[in-house]
C-alpha cells in the first residue's frame, strides 16, 4: 500500500506541476534535475482497531528542491500553497477510492522545502482459508 500511495502522490504532483518538475520516488545521488520533488514514507504505523480491522497511518515527506535563482524562499512559499491544494485529496491506486491528507505542514530548511502529510485509513485483514477436515474418527470409552 505504501508504494501505491507514493505513486498516487506522484500522479497528483505531476497533475499540478506538469513535466517541468521532476518527481523522484527514491533519492538520487547524481544527475539531479531541479526543480524536483522527492517522495518518502517516514513512519507507517498499524494498530488493531476491532476484530480484523486495523487503523493504518502513513506519514509522508515530500521534499521540494527549487531551481537556483536567488528566490528559493519565495518559490517554496508558492509551492507550499499548491501542495496544500493538490495533496489534500488523492486517489489511491489500489482501490481507486479517494483518501484525504491530514496534518499537513511545511518546513523550509537549508534551501529545501519539506512538506509533511499523513494519509490514514482502515484496512481489514483477510483470514487465510484453512481447508476443512473431511472425516473425524473418534472412540468413546464406556
Segments from the language model and where they lie:
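Short acidic low-complexity segments
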Residues: 24-33
